[in-house]
Amino acid sequence: MTITKNKISLMLSSKLGFSNNLCEAIVNTVFSNILEIAKVQKLTLKNFGSFEVKQKTPRPGINFHTKSPVMIASKKNLRFTPSEKLKALINKSML
């Protein structure tokens, strides 16, 4: 199931009784702050998980069209690691 920021703001609006515009601004601010922090350092949200930027090293690859070897450039990836509590909650709900 995919959930959008708009759906999250609508859920907040209905649960908290705030206007949808206010909840949308809150959700956008939270996500942009998470992104800004995660770009610079590891971000851990207690009982949820951690966001961390990892640098992938350059590696050899193959161009599928020409079959010639190429070097794949290094790049940064955002990695999410769920907390043990979140994993337990997910596994509990699957039973």
From Swiss-Prot:
It comes from Rickettsia prowazekii (strain Madrid E). GO terms for cellular component: cytosol. PANTHER family: DNA-BINDING PROTEIN HU (PTHR33175), INTEGRATION HOST FACTOR SUBUNIT ALPHA (PTHR33175:SF2). This is Histone-like DNA-binding protein. InterPro entries: Hist_DNA-bd, IHF-like_DNA-bd_dom_sf. One of its GO terms (molecular function) is structural constituent of chromatin. It comes from the Bacteria. Keywords: DNA-binding. Belongs to the bacterial histone-like protein family.
